[in-house]
């Protein structure tokens, strides 16, 4: 343990419009006595010994032995030529207080990455706590009375069916897992989905299904819509050609079980990337494919929970326009606030990483987050998320302040009511006036 100094310069921009005073909360009341005030966190001792952040106080409970479940889902008509039923496989760990009959909420990681890879070189299955994201939940939240669930999407690990790569079938399977987790006799009925990248996309897939059990999502650089991820300003990224086929080949076991994965949605996915890459906007046929894989627009008005958005502002994999972009004139972050959703954000100058992933917060060039590295890692992330989950999954503690924590390019952190600030000046830039020097 050593005293953290990463927030010592935090919030120096408080005089700016849209910032919160140190004693304010979303409800306008001071709740400083319940949790340490965010402005005092730089004075606290944080556990810097591991590879991820820890909560301030250890929990009183222990994790019970892993349990597994298989959920059979009616998939009639979901996949062209696919099976009429398919299984979703998941593993889960309960805290020891469930032995006394206490009901607990669930934090789920929903992923295609369990048993992912070629035979003989696969990642761990769902019944082993996943490195990083699973361990973070297991060590921080299970001792405080939360269940951890690891869910394999259709056609991955021991789940069956077709891998339609974020399509309607995958969304149905995720929804079925959320419903199952919320309906168990040990569950208090409240489920969260947490994860980065694809595992953040599954949070939006679940939100688009509108389960009453899904109370909050924490997408960390999570894809919100596939087409804007791969196609920007009329041009395509090279990876767009192989996204579906790359995942599809990595989940094959090269045995008879792979026959379940031969359905038209999979074939369409193999064609969609190269076709759109080659033809661009001259390819209207594939619009249906990409529309099916846009989830943030479908979730708006259907999802009935909160959102804690985490985004690397230097992320070139799932870049920030997935949060702050959208159709012309749309900023999804603000659109959800305007629609009445309870939204918070942690927006750092890291790349495609977690807020506390210090092992990755060290290799960014000047102008691409390098100036912020010294103050980048958020060792308070575990506590910050704990306070969020306590309120939205258990109804315990004060309502979190619904603000955006944003890191400047020089490393300083500040709080804004939203991002970008509503009173920001937008200055048009005429690119024809910019002179680009020839390389010497």
Question: Residue spans of the language-model regions?
Answer:
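Residue-level detector of conserved catalytic or cofactor/ligand-binding positions
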Residues: 431-440
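A catalytic-pocket lid/entrance helix-loop region that shapes and gates access to the active site
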Residues: 169, 194, 198-263, 313, ...
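Cap/lid segment of the alpha/beta-hydrolase catalytic domain
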Residues: 106-182, 358-372
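Accessory cap/linker subdomain of secreted extracellular hydrolases
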Residues: 31-58, 127, 131-137, 143, ...
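Gly/Ser-rich "nucleophile elbow"/oxyanion-hole loop immediately N-terminal to the catalytic nucleophile
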Residues: 96-101, 162-169, 176-197
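N-terminal cap/lid segment of alpha/beta-hydrolase-fold proteins
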Residues: 50-99
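Short beta-strand/loop motif that positions the catalytic acidic residue
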Residues: 309-311
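Secretory targeting signatures
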Residues: 1-34
């Amino acid at each position: 343990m050593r005293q953290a100094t990463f927030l010592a310069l935090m919030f120096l921009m408080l005089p700016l419009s849209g910032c919160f005073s140190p004693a304010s909360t979303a409800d306008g009341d001071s709740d400083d006595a319940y949790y340490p005030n965010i402005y005092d966190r730089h004075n606290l001792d944080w556990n810097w010994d591991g590879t991820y952040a820890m909560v301030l106080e250890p929990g009183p409970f222990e994790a019970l032995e892993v349990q597994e479940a298989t959920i059979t889902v009616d998939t009639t008509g979901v996949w062209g030529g696919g099976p009429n039923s398919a299984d979703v496989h998941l593993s889960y760990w309960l805290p020891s207080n469930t032995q006394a009959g206490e009901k607990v909420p669930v934090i789920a990681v929903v992923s295609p990455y369990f048993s992912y890879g070629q035979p003989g070189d696969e990642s761990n299955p769902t019944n082993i706590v996943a490195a990083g994201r699973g361990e973070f939940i297991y060590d921080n939240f299970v001792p405080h009375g939360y269940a951890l669930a690891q869910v394999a999407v259709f056609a991955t690990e021991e789940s069956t069916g077709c891998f339609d790569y974020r399509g309607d079938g995958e969304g149905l399977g995720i929804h079925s897992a959320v419903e199952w987790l919320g309906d168990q006799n040990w569950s208090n009925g409240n489920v969260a989905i947490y994860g980065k990248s694809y595992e953040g996309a599954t949070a939006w897939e679940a939100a688009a299904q509108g389960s009453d059990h899904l109370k909050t999502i924490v997408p960390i650089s999570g894809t919100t819509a596939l087409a804007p991820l791969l196609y920007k300003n009329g041009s395509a990224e090279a990876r767009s050609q192989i996204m579906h086929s790359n995942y599809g080949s990595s989940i094959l076991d090269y045995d008879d079980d792979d026959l379940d994965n031969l359905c038209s949605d999979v074939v369409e996915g193999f064609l969609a990337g190269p076709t759109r890459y080659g033809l661009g906007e001259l390819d209207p046929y594939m619009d249906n494919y990409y529309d099916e894989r846009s989830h943030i627009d479908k979730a708006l008005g259907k999802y009935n929970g909160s959102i804690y958005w985490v985004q690397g502002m230097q992320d070139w994999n799932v870049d920030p326009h997935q949060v702050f972009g959208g159709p012309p004139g749309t900023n999804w972050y603000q659109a959800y606030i305007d629609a009445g959703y309870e939204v918070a954000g942690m927006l750092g100058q890291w790349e495609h990483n977690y807020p506390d992933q210090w092992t990755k917060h060290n290799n960014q060039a000047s102008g691409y987050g390098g100036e912020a590295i010294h103050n980048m890692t958020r060792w308070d992330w575990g506590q910050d998320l704990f306070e969020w989950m306590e309120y939205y999954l258990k109804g315990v503690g004060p309502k979190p302040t619904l603000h955006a924590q944003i890191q400047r390019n020089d490393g300083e952190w500040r709080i804004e009511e939203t991002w970008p600030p509503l009173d920001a000046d937008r200055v048009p830039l005429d690119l024809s006036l910019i002179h680009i020097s020839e390389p010497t």
